[in-house]
């Protein structure tokens, strides 16, 4: 039970970060925010990961760096979309990476995904169409978040193919460090880099950099050794629900019947597609969810 509670707590933290990040990037440049966020995450993981990085070798380090740059691209798209649409929409559309993962595996590796996954695609796509028809968000924002979900799905599939033989903590550290480097270059090129000011920005940076990323990874690793895969999947399915809860209570999201119906359809699509995604990833889908919380 403590492990399940810990996992649910982590998903609640992920849910509230969407609200915090939306508020922060309204007053602090997007790429600068993400660069600092990944700098904090990398620094937090540096101590426990430092002795393990050598074990990755050159191939592992290069692979981690490449996947880290993909991760940075996904976060940039997701956060740009979050700026333009609602917190609740962002949470549910981001969750569509579960639906898209089997499709990307099909395209790249001809993996079979089954009728349930196709059903999930259809239902989730219908939900996305319903969300795009409301006035609370924006089609452009929703599409940016959907593009982020596609990048996350690609990153997941490549991760499963090339990373299982490497230490998870060391590989994650390299990914986060590479994401930081890539985002830093963009922030400097745009002239956006500056010292963050105010609790709104620093609060979001600390929660996303320390609790949602680095400590979230450690809690997740501890908890998943002490509970079943079924309970883990149950806990992680709460993330979009938490996002909607905090979007409604803290960000004032009012999506109406059509919008909330779209969220429900996307959630149903995720539930339908998740078994196929788990098969594609040899049961490792839950261990990768951490990467795509705000």
How would you describe each model-predicted region?
Residues 13, 17-18, 46-94, 130, ...:
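Specific transmembrane alpha-helical segments of multi-pass solute transporters/efflux pumps
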Residues 35-36, 90-98, 158-181, 213-249:
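Helix-helix packing/entry segments at the starts of transmembrane helices
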Residues 1, 38-39, 128, 201-203, ...:
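C-terminal-most transmembrane helix of multi-pass membrane proteins
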Residues 1-32, 69, 73, 77, ...:
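Glycine-/small-residue-enriched transmembrane alpha-helix faces in small-molecule transporters
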